[in-house]
Regions:
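Class II aminoacyl-tRNA synthetase catalytic cores and aaRS-like
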Residues: 1-193
Length: 193
């Protein structure tokens, strides 16, 4: 069965009872004796989907129940509409495959993390709710701005970036001045004007 992105499920929810396959990582994993819940996200949209898994349907129930946050899964199951719940639908799992376990040493945890702490792991920040939302807003704002100017006949040009850093001799390629560097005009105090 072909993988379905969560964003497409939220845009056009299939009929109740439709079989779907989704992949993603666990935002939360909760379980009791016979039933468990995974909040699964795939990065295609902000909202996760709730996966319901039951001990009598899955041989690997105990393995799944022990999985930590950010473990990646492939889930095949039945989409069930839930109009009276917080989410519009959930997926009752028929099979769950653990694609990649995630141990307790993984730096992102369910507890609140400070911005200073997240700054040390820039490659993982998009997985947090705060940065995920901020990047989506920035992406939509940039798209709207580019679309507006494009529709009004403007051309987007990638201009060179001038910086004060001279890394590995890159600044020797060209100079950004019209002055003769061998004979720079100086003011009365001897400084460059």
């Amino acid at each position: 069965m072909q993988r379905t992105e969560l964003a497409s499920l939220y845009k056009a929810t299939p009929a109740d009872g439709t079989k779907v396959t989704v992949c993603g990582w666990a935002k939360t994993v909760r379980d009791s004796k016979n039933i468990g819940f995974i909040s699964l996200s795939d990065g295609s949209c902000y909202k996760p989907v709730q996966i319901v898994f039951q001990a009598d349907k899955l041989a690997n129930y105990a393995e799944i129940a022990k999985c930590g946050l950010y473990t990646s899964f492939e889930v095949t199951g039945t989409l069930v509409l839930t109009p009276n719940a917080k989410q519009p639908f959930e997926i009752n799992a028929d099979t769950i495959t653990v694609l990649g376990p995630c141990g307790p040493e993984y730096p992102l945890q369910k507890k609140k993390m400070s911005m200073d702490y997240l700054r040390t792991m820039t490659h993982l920040r998009p997985r947090t709710n705060t940065f995920n939302a901020a990047f989506r807003v920035r992406g939509q704002a940039a798209f709207a701005l580019h679309q507006f100017f494009h529709e009004h006949g403007f051309t987007y040009v990638h201009t060179p970036i001038f910086t004060g850093s001279d890394c590995e001799g890159a600044g020797e390629m060209f100079q950004v001045t019209t002055l003769d560097l061998n004979d720079i005009p100086r003011n009365e105090e001897g400084g460059v004007d």
